Amino acid sequence: MFIAIKTDDGRIKGKISFYCRVLHVSRQAFNKYLKTKDSPWKYQSLADAMLDICKEDECNDTYGRIRMYQALQLKQPEGVHIPGERTVYRVMEEIGLNYKPKRKPNGITKADKEARKSDDLIKRDFTAKKPLEKCITDITEIKASDGKLYVSAIFDCYDLAVLGLAMDTNMKAALCKQTLDNAYRAYPTLRGAILHSDRGTQYTSELYRKAINKYGILQSMNSASGRCHDNARCESMWARFKEELLYGRYDTTTMTVEQLKTLIWRYFISYWNNRRICSANGGLPPMVKRQQYYASLQEAA
C-alpha cells in the first residue's frame, strides 16, 4: 500500500522493483493490489451479517469465533456465503469483534464439616441423554449499591437451560429452597432427576433436604469440599453470565439490588434460555434444543 500511494501521487523516484525488494513485497503482489484496491471487500456482506447479529442482543458482542460461526449457520442470512470457521475468525478480527474473557469468578459457598453429605452421583459427567435427567445448582454473588445480591440457579445438563432461578440479599438455605420450588413449579417432571451441588451449608441443611425429598429428587454432592472441578459446569455458567452481562458493561456498584434483579432475570429467562447461541448445544439456544428433543419423540410415536 505504501508503494501504491507513493506512485499514485508521483512523489516517488526510482524503480518500483527496488522498493518492492526493500519492503519485501513481490512485484506480483503489488500489481494485484493495484488491480483490486478499489474493489469492494469480498467479505463485506459477511461482516455486515456479523454486526447485525451483535446488535440483536446486547450480550451478543461477547461471541467468539465458534459461537459467531454457529449463529451464522443457524440464521443463514440471505445473500451471505458462510465460509469456514477460520475465515469467520479472520473477518471478526478485521472488524474488531475479537472478544476475550477477562475474569473468572470464585465459588462462595462454604462446607459444613459436621453435616451429613450425599454421594457424588455425577462424578464430573455433566452430559445427559434427555431433559430433566441431570441438573446442577450453585450460588453466586454480585455487589450492588445497597448491598450484595445472591443469585441461585438450577441448570439442566441436557441443554444448559435455567430451570429455576431465585435471588435474595442473603445466601441462606431458604434461597436454595426457593430455587428448587421455582424449578419444580415450572417442571413437575423434575421428580426423579439428579440434582448436583457443592457441599455448602445451604445444600446440607435440613430445610433443603426436606424439599429435595418432597419433590422426589436425588441429591448429589461434590466428592469433597474444595474440589471445584466436581461442579465445574455450574462455575462455568456463572463465569459466562458475568462476562457476558456484567464485566465491562455495567458498574453493578452503582445499581440497586432491585435493578440487578430485573437485569439478571431478563438475561437468564429471556436471553439465555431462548436466544443465546450455546456451543455445547451445537449452536442451538437451550429451549430450541429442548423443543427439538420433544418433537423427535412425537415423530417417533
Across the structure, where does each feature detected by a protein language model lie?
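Short, amphipathic alpha-helical "recognition" segments used to contact nucleic acids or chromatin
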Residues: 1-13, 51-58
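Basic, flexible linker segments flanking DNA-binding modules
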Residues: 20, 27-130, 228, 285-295
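RNase H-like polynucleotidyl transferase catalytic core
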Residues: 101-107, 195-199, 213-233, 247-255, ...
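RNase H-like two-metal-ion nuclease catalytic core shared by retroviral integrases
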Residues: 111, 197-199, 205-209, 221-244, ...
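Two-metal-ion RNase H-like nuclease active-site motif
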Residues: 122, 133-142
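Active-site beta-loop-alpha junctions of metal-dependent nucleic acid enzymes
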Residues: 143, 147, 165-188, 204
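C-terminal domain-tail junction helix/linker
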Residues: 213-215, 239-301
